[in-house]
Design a protein with these regions (language model features):
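Low-complexity, intrinsically disordered Gly/Pro/Thr-rich segments
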Residues: 86-99
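Short, intrinsically disordered N-terminal pre-domain segments
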Residues: 1-16, 116-118
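Acidic, aromatic-enriched beta-alpha/helix-loop junctions
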Residues: 41-89
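C-terminal charged interaction modules
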Residues: 97-118
């Protein structure tokens, strides 16, 4: 399955992450729904996690590890989850293979990809 970056008015869309605020929670509207994301950092394992909540504060996913190039929330999907596919990646051509404190939110962003429904 090929994924296409969502392209509106030639702007590549992504969810902004500010590692200087971690741990923190923010809301974002994706397609027709608003979600809350809580971004945390596990200093021992050196990885980020994201908790996903619906507009009513119900937990959809807890402790999802942010892995470079792997779609978030891909293990369990149903109609409550975001329509776009969210993939942590770098589109600058740099050779990055993991999400780190130094690159997350800067070079590595949570890019939105069009979900192909077949």
């Amino acid at each position: 399955m090929a994924l296409q970056l969502i392209d509106l008015n030639s702007d590549v869309q992504y969810i902004t992450i500010d590692v200087s605020r971690v741990p923190y929670t923010f809301s974002v509207k994706l397609t027709d729904r608003t979600y809350s994301f809580t971004v945390k950092y596990n200093a021992t394992g050196k990885f980020f996690t994201i908790d996903l909540y619906d507009v009513n504060g119900n937990v959809l996913t807890f402790g999802e590890i942010v892995r470079y190039g792997r779609p978030l929330f891909n293990v369990v999907e149903d109609e409550r989850f975001p329509i776009p596919v969210i993939i942590p990646s770098c589109i600058t051509g740099d050779s990055i293979s993991e999400v780190t404190w130094e690159n997350f939110g800067k070079d590595v962003k949570l890019y939105l990809h069009e979900r192909k429904v077949e």
